[in-house]
UniProtKB/Swiss-Prot annotation:
This is Heat shock 70 kDa protein. Residues 622-655 are annotated as: Disordered. The keyword ATP-binding applies. Coiled coil: none annotated. It comes from Daucus carota (Wild carrot). PANTHER family: HEAT SHOCK PROTEIN 70KDA.
Length: 655
């Protein structure tokens, strides 16, 4: 929701550089900063007298321990996260664990030691982008659309929204970076009015990498399957050069500069410059640093071939998400009409060559500015949300959720409510019930992943990712109707609601805590494991379903024969037969927890063969034989017995 008055802006909050745009005079204006540059370094420096934003990058070598960069790599992460620990080895910054294991950046400011969370640092960058926009527009700005990598999890998205709040902004929407690039591409091509197109966005920036396949048709932008690495980009390519030259300096001069902040930062700046030079037409460049450490100068040369060799595994790593994106989208590479390059790191010739080779020599689309495309799309989205960009109101962006979301039901089964690649925002609900007679409450545990068993998936949010619904009135198992709702908003943030429809008891949770969701590595690992163990998962799932079907049928029969509202009376002999058979089945289940699927199914058929004819005769007395299985019978709740075809809702049980 936009605030009253003023324009809304779009901000690309990047790992290394940020950019801001606004919709004005029927077009997007990418706004230059006070130095005349259309992108601003995402750097923040603290001195004895002031704070420097953006321009801080120019004095980083003189003040390395107090110049903060790469803050985006800390957003929404915990201190002990592997990527945080890995990055800390390369930073001249001091990072310590804060409350709740939140990484805190330590700097000296005005003679005092201060600690800042990544959200605070990023908010300072946002404030700078806000000031740039306000200086250009001549009035205050309250509303903004802010971009994030496609695979940012719930806690990272919420942390980004918090960053906006700290900066005094109303964050109208958190939007995925490749989707913004897609909007920029779509508007660039709109004048030619192309038919339906499959467009692959290849977004390789300073710290993150996103791939998305989108279909454009008549102003509708539908995301098919996003893939991402939230820890891969130009900074990592720089690190390879830095490590190479640290080793070279040690070999030639017997001096180790790995822990020397000033020397390391000067070397890193030179390496970034060399990378940019090698990405242009130059095949070789030199690095010259006077008095790098203890009066020793450093001079070396680096060729493009050597640079490519040092980073080849990372370059090839960029192709894996492309392949997975196409596979999940069920689209062949030959069906991709355009491959759009976004992000400064796509200027690297070897990256372009590998991508072109992957698509069998297809010409890559370079018509949009890779540094500005994301901010461009964000500005368009901001205009639409604020009601300003009426000319673009026919543009509809359909995003998706990257992994399946569900909860744990009886037997540790992952019951999926929202499958992966579902278009968001979305809202799905399902009826569940109790597992035991007179059960006073249920535990709702939210999971994310593709495995059949919840123990193989990731519990979302740990302590905040589960909640209890208590106060359920005493009733036989399977009778209470518990409505569970999963609601994902347009920002990709999940809310879970649960309500006992009989008693009116309610509870809810928003999965936004600092424990976070899945990192890219965890996602890739889970998907690989899911592929590897798919057959095993299916077998386990079948066993649990067969066991639950037998158990549900047995308890439903027990409840049915005890129900005094049953029309007609059971013959005493028939009632005893059912009681005996049910007790034997339950006892057999308790003794055979590891029974195979066929054994469980045979036992169920045996029990059905005895009970069904008796129950059918009971209902035939009134001429209203129930349709479907015993899950539809009186007293049985909605057990969801195998083979049931009743029209009632399918209800699964929650421990």
């Amino acid at each position: 929701m936009a605030s009253k008055g003023g324009k809304a802006i779009g901000i690309d909050l990047g790992t290394t550089y940020s950019c801001v745009g606004v919709w004005q005079n029927d077009r997007v204006e990418i706004i230059a900063n006070d130095q005349g540059n259309r992108t601003t370094p995402s750097y923040f420096a603290f001195t004895d007298t002031s704070r420097l934003i953006g321009d801080a990058k120019n004095q980083v070598a003189m003040n390395p321990s107090n110049t903060v960069f790469d803050a985006k790599r800390l957003i929404g992460r915990r201190f002990n996260h592997p990527s945080v620990q890995s990055d800390m080895k390369l930073w001249p910054l001091q990072v310590i664990p804060g409350p709740g294991e939140k990484p805190m950046i330590v700097v000296n400011y005005k003679g005092e030691s201060k600690q800042f969370a990544a959200e605070e640092i990023s908010s300072m960058v946002l404030i700078k982008m806000l000031e740039i926009a306000e200086a250009f527009l001549g009035h205050s700005v309250n509303d903004a659309v802010v971009t994030v990598p496609a695979y940012f999890n719930d806690s990272q998205r919420q942390a980004t929204k918090d960053t906006g709040v700290i900066a005094g902004l109303n964050v109208m929407r958190i939007i995925n970076e490749p989707n913004c690039a897609q909007i920029a591409y779509g508007l660039d091509k709109k004048s030619s009015n192309p038919p339906e197109q499959n467009v692959l966005i290849f977004d390789l920036g300073g710290g993150t990498f996103d791939v998305s396949l989108l279909t454009i048709e008549e102003g509708i932008y539908e995301v098919k399957a996003p893939k991402s690495d939230t820890h891969l980009g130009g900074e990592d390519f720089d690190n390879r050069l830095v490590n190479r030259f640290v080793t070279e300096f040690l070999t030639n001069n017997k001096k180790d500069i790995r822990w020397e902040c000033e020397a390391l930062r000067r070397l890193r700046t030179a390496c970034e410059r060399a990378k940019r030079t090698l990405s242009s037409s130059t095949a070789q460049t030199t690095i010259e640093i006077d008095s790098l450490y203890e009066g020793v100068d450093f001079y070396t040369t680096i060729t493009r071939a050597r640079f490519e060799e040092l980073n080849m595994d990372l370059f090839k790593k960029c192709m894996d998400p492309v392949e997975k994106c196409l596979r999940d989208s069920k689209i062949d590479k030959a069906q991709v009409h355009e491959v759009v390059l976004v992000g400064g790191s796509t200027r690297i010739p070897k990256v372009q060559q590998l991508l072109q080779d992957f698509f069998n020599g297809k010409e890559l689309c370079k018509s949009i500015n890779p540094d500005e495309a994301v901010a461009y799309g964000a500005a368009v989205q901001a205009a639409i949300l604020s009601g300003e960009g009426n000319e673009r109101s026919d543009l509809l962006l359909l995003d998706v959720t990257p992994l399946s979301l569900g909860l744990e039901t009886a037997g540790g089964v992952m019951t999926v409510l929202i499958p992966r690649n579902t278009t968001i925002p979305t809202k799905k609900e399902q009826i569940f019930s109790t597992y035991s007679d007179n059960q006073p409450g249920v535990l709702i545990q939210v999971y994310e992943g593709e495995r059949a068993r919840t123990r193989d998936n990731k519990l979302l949010g740990k302590l905040l990712g589960k909640f209890e619904l208590t106060g359920i009135p005493p009733a036989p198992r399977g009778v209470p109707q518990i409505n569970v709702v999963f609601d994902i908003d347009a920002n990709g943030i999940l809310n879970v609601f649960a309500e006992d429809k009989t008693a009116g008891v309610k509870n809810k949770i928003t999965i936004t805590n600092d424990n976070g969701r899945l990192s890219k590595d965890e996602i890739e690992k889970l998907v690989k494991e899911a592929e590897k163990y798919k057959a095993e998962d299916e077998e386990v799932k079948k066993k649990v379903e067969a066991k639950n079907a037998l158990e549900n049928y047995a308890y439903n029969m027990r409840n049915t024969i005890k129900d005094d509202k049953i029309p007609g009376k059971l013959d005493a002999g028939d009632k005893e037969k059912i009681e005996t058979a049910v007790n034997e089945a339950i006892e057999w289940l308790e003794k055979n927890q590891l029974a195979e699927v066929d054994e469980l199914e045979d036992k169920l058929k045996e029990l059905e063969g005895l009970c069904n004819p008796i129950i059918a005769r009971l209902y035939q007395g009134r001429g209203d034989v129930p349709i479907g299985g015993p899950g539809d019978m009186p007293g049985g709740g909605y057990g969801g017995s195998r083979g049931s075809s009743g029209a009632g809702p399918k209800i699964e049980e929650v421990d």
